[in-house]
């Protein structure tokens, strides 16, 4: 069980929270914020070295899966909040996007 889930359950919130594994954000969703060129390079692990260094993480399939899942979770959480009044992404807050870089 992930640490945030254990923390929430330990605080007696088990019956108040719904945890879900998000669907990864699609290419179409990602290019609503980032340029198509940047997204293609990120997804194919072909970012220029300078940009990869700026992000601060080594390019890898694991990083791509993590980031598109985080974005997907934020989008799904926002939709849930619109429908139900409240939501939060326990993995969010680490992504600060610009159109042409991470």
Model-identified regions with their sequence ranges:
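HDAC/HDAC-like amidohydrolase catalytic core signature
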Residues: 1-102
């Amino acid at each position: 069980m992930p640490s945030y889930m254990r923390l929430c359950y330990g605080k007696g919130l088990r019956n108040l929270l719904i945890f879900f594994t998000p669907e990864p954000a699609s290419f179409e969703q990602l290019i609503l914020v980032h340029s198509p060129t940047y997204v293609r390079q990120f997804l194919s692990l072909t970012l220029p070295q300078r940009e990869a260094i700026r992000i601060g993480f080594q390019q890898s399939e694991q990083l791509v899966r993590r980031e598109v899942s985080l974005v997907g979770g934020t989008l799904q959480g926002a939709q849930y909040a619109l429908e139900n009044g409240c939501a939060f992404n326990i993995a969010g807050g680490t992504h600060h996007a610009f159109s042409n870089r991470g």
